[in-house]
Amino acid sequence: MTRRLFVLAALALAVTTTVAYAATLTVSSWHLWAGSQTLTKATCTVTGAQTDTYVDQNAATTSFGAAATLNLIPSGDSPKERWVFVEFDLSSCAIPATGGADSATLSLYLSAAPTTSFNFDATRVTSAWAGTLTWNQAQALTYAGSPTTSSTGGTTGGVRISFPVTVDVDSFIKGGSNFGWRISDSGSGQNAVKDLATFASTDSGANVPTLTINYES
């Protein structure tokens, strides 16, 4: 009688052990399956904008799309304020719509600095524009409600100013409209000569605007 109870207990223990092992194996297998998914990370740098220009409040109907420079003057110098516009074609990066931007940085080369430090604002443009854009036409464009990012520029030229624009580029990758950015400064200035910030345009052929994207797919 005692031996029979012992055998039954041993069999029950064996069944329990087997079931427990099988459950653990299933969970482990799921983790292995999840870990086997391939995540590709890469970097793409777009050198040169598809379109870039600046607009001048003091020359409201003039286009500067072929200029070698992108000139910016803060709003405090009105009516001589100037805005910069830049847009990049991301198709060369071939990032799938299922991918996403881990980081994205817009870089502009400040070839000539103002005499006072600027706080440059990069604001997403939400309607289409062309290289023939004028100041008057820029007033009819639509923009995001607030700047995507701001970057401080000093009083020394020959440096690059970087703008983190990850949230916008991630939207572009996922199918959002890509009309680039407006670069402006809402600060008060001294005068239109002292406060002129000059960036190199794509037409300059050197130190052109770039957009660097670290992404996953």
Tell me the role of every PLM-derived stretch.
Residues 1-42:
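Long, small/polar-residue-biased beta-strand-and-loop interaction regions
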Residues 8, 12-15, 92-95, 168-172:
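Short, surface-exposed loop/turn segments at beta-strand-coil junctions that are enriched for proline
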Residues 25-92, 130, 142-144, 186-193, ...:
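Flexible, small-residue-rich N-terminal segments that precede or flank a structured functional core
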Residues 45-50, 110-179, 205:
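Beta-strand-rich interaction/scaffold domains
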Residues 80-83, 93-105:
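Extended extracellular/luminal ectodomain segments enriched in beta-structured repeat modules
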Residues 88, 99-112, 211:
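A short beta-strand element within beta-rich, extracytoplasmic domains
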Residues 97-98, 114-118, 189-199:
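Extracytoplasmic/secreted cell-surface and envelope-processing proteins
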Residues 173-192:
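Extracellular beta-strand ligand-recognition surfaces/modules
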